[in-house]
Amino acid sequence: MTIRKAIRVERSPEVVFRVFTQEIGKWWPLKEGFSFGGEKAKDIFIEGRVGGRFFERFTDGTEFEVGRITAFQPPHVVAWTWKDPSWEAETEVEVKFEPDGTGTRIELEHRGWEAGPIMQKQGQGYSDGWGIILEKFTSMI
């Protein structure tokens, strides 16, 4: 199973990519349940380089690494691994930013759900979640 979501925003790919990656802590809905740390979650970061971390920082200063950046090509694509501690394997998230007239089309794929029964079961929830996350992003940009 591969989760696919797409949405369009009326901003340039350069602006959209920068806000998505460098300002993720301003728009990601941590306090709305989209966090591994729950109530402890304070901030979220993407380190802008291949091999960098996608991680949450908690109120006590500890961190949880969601995954590692596997592609970072401004303003076109960012990708990272994603692993819940209960899963059998990692998944991968890839986000592309394509020029679309005077705006940008954002295409997200989250793949690798076939690795185990726990992951297959949780895939639908993640599909719904990515829709909410992208809507939150577009409302903040």
Regions found by a protein language model. Name each.
Residues 45, 55-102, 111-114:
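Hydrophobic-ligand binding "helix-grip"
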Residues 9-11, 48, 71:
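Conserved strand-loop elements at the edges of beta-sheets that form or border functional pockets
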Residues 1-14, 57, 99-107, 139:
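Aromatic-glycine hotspot motif
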Residues 24, 111-141:
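A conserved amphipathic terminal alpha-helix motif
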Residues 1-42:
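Hydrophobic ligand-binding cavity/cleft-lining segments
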Residues 16-20, 54, 69, 78-80, ...:
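Hydrophobic pocket/interface hotspot
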